[in-house]
Amino acid sequence: MAVQQRKKKEGRKSDKNAPSVPQVDASLDKPLDIDAPPTIYSVNLKPEYGTAALNLSADFIRQEQALANKYLFFHPVILVVLTIGLLIYLTPRIVFPIRNTGSVAGWFYQLARINKKVVLSGLVFTAIGASFLFTLLSRVSDSYFKSKINQLVGSKGEKVFGINLNDLVARHETKDPVVNNTHIIVYRETPIALISLAPNMTLSTDENLVMSVTTVGCRRVYVKSGIIEDLIDWAMLHSKNIRSSGKYGETMKLLIDVYSFDSTLKEILKKKGFTYIQSIRVSENRLLGGLFGVKKELWGLQFHFKAEHKD
C-alpha cells in the first residue's frame, strides 16, 4: 500500500511537467463575445478556469476599493473639512448688504448678487480642495487594497481557493475535492461570477461545522442582476452537503466577512437570513480603520438539523 501511495505522489509530481491547460479567456476589460451562444451554466474550479478565477477574485477586491473611495469621499470628516475651508475662504471676502430690503429672501438675494464673483471663486477653491483630498484618499485606499491583491496573487490563489492555481493549471485534471468548493458562473462562454468556500478549521468542531466564504462577487455590470443571491444560495446548499457527507452534529454555520461600507452585500445577506455577529476595525491601515472607521463585519447564518436516529 505504501508503495502504491508513493507511486501516486510521484505521478502527481510528473503532472507538473505536463503542458499547462489552455485557459478560458479571463480578460475583464473586454465585452462578452456576442457570437457565443447565450447560455449560462456553472462549473467547479476546473484547470481551464484557474486564471479566470484569480482575475475575478482580484477584480472583486478592486470593486471593494471603488466602494471604499466613495465612502471616504462622502465621509462626514471630509465634508466638514471642505465646509470649514470654504468658510475660511469666504469670510474675509464677503460684503454684506447695507440697505434693508424688508425681507429675508430679499436680503439673501442682494448678498448673493453682491458676492457673485466671490462665491464662484470659493466654489472653485472648494472643488480644487476636494480634488486634492480625493487623490489623497484614493492613494490611502489603493495601498490597502493593493496589498490584498498582492496577497492573493502571491499565494497563487491558495489563500482563497485552498489550492495553488499554478499547480491546478499545470494538470489536465485534478481529483482534489477542494475544487468542488468553488462555484463559477459562465455566460456566453465567459466566467462572470464566482464564490468559494472553505471549512473554518479554527471554529469547526466535531459537533459544529463552520464554513467560511473566502470570496464572492461578479462582474460589475451584473451586480444588480440577482446573481450574487444565486451564489449565496449555492453556498448554503453546498455547506449542507458537506455537513451531510461528514460526521458532524446538529448545527452548522456559514460565515462571511463584509466591509462596513458594502451596503449592497449586507442587504443581500439580510434577505438570505444572515445576521450581524461582530465587527473589528481595519488594523492594516490606521487612516481607514482609525480616522474613517472602516470595519470588517462578520455575518453568519446558522442551521439546525434533526438528529438522525439509527435502529
Swiss-Prot record:
Residues 1-70, 139-311 are cytoplasmic. It is a multi-pass membrane protein. It comes from the Eukaryota. The chain crosses the membrane at residues 71-91, 118-138. It is found in: Membrane. Residues 1-11 have a biased composition (Basic residues). GO terms for cellular component: endoplasmic reticulum; membrane. The keyword Cytoplasm does not apply. Residues 1-31 are annotated as: Disordered. Disulfide bonds: none annotated. Keywords: Membrane, Phosphate transport, Transmembrane, Transmembrane helix, Transport. Residues 92-117 are extracellular. One of its GO terms (biological process) is protein folding. One of its GO terms (molecular function) is unfolded protein binding. Its main location: membrane. Involved in the uptake of inorganic phosphate. This is Inorganic phosphate transporter PHO86. It comes from Saccharomyces cerevisiae (strain ATCC 204508 / S288c). The gene is PHO86.
